[in-house]
Amino acid sequence: MFTSAHANRSAQASASAGHYAHRSGEQTANGLISEIVYREDQPMMTQLLLLPLLQQLGQQSRWQLWLTPQQKLSREWVQSAGLPLSKVMQISQLSPCHTVDSMIRALRTGNYSVVICWLTEELTAEEHERLVNAAQEGCAMGFIMRPVRNQGTLGRQLSGLKIHSNLYH
């Protein structure tokens, strides 16, 4: 998983998710927009990172909105992931050109604790600013999921952190 340029430019994006968790159980302290760039061949890594936060947000009275490109969330997956089926809403088959505007409108309402969408292209600076303002206005979190394909290493390792574990060797 990688972080995008927009995620690194905002002090809010670098704050821990716990800072934004509910104190009273009703409203987050502030809005947050985060772009999560992940490898399509390793979707479990993203789930391991996001599910605990989504489960915690599921304890709020507000909805969770998933703006998905084509696939529909399965009820079985939502339940097995520990998310409240009664608070998860999904809009699928959404055109990519309408996704950011739909996310802005949803965040602004304050009806959602979190809005998650999938985009294939990076956000512009103006789109990012509009999303941050909408998230702050609605005291909500927004996650932009952006998959990248594994391009292969072409004989050399990509730079990054490598953690060795005796549990797997």
UniProtKB/Swiss-Prot annotation:
Region of interest: Lon protease binding: 162-169
Pfam families according to UniProt: SulA
Polar residues: bias regions: 1-15
Site feature: Essential for degradation by Lon protease: 169
GO-annotated biological processes: division septum assembly; DNA repair; negative regulation of cell division; SOS response
Entry-linked SUPFAM superfamilies: P-loop containing nucleoside triphosphate hydrolases
Keyword vocabulary terms for this entry: Cell cycle, Cell division, DNA damage, Septation, SOS response
Post-translational modification: Is rapidly cleaved and degraded by the Lon protease once DNA damage is repaired.
Region feature (Disordered): 1-22
Induction: By DNA damage, as part of the SOS response.
Region of interest (FtsZ binding), ranges: 106-112
Protein's job: Component of the SOS system and an inhibitor of cell division. Accumulation of SulA causes rapid cessation of cell division and the appearance of long, non-septate filaments. In the presence of GTP, binds a polymerization-competent form of FtsZ in a 1:1 ratio, thus inhibiting FtsZ polymerization and therefore preventing it from participating in the assembly of the Z ring. This mechanism prevents the premature segregation of damaged DNA to daughter cells during cell division.
Family label: Belongs to the SulA family.
Subunit structure, interactors included: Interacts with FtsZ.
UniProt xrefs under NCBIfam families: PRK10595.1, SOS_SulA_coli
Protein name: Cell division inhibitor SulA
Gene responsible for this protein: sulA
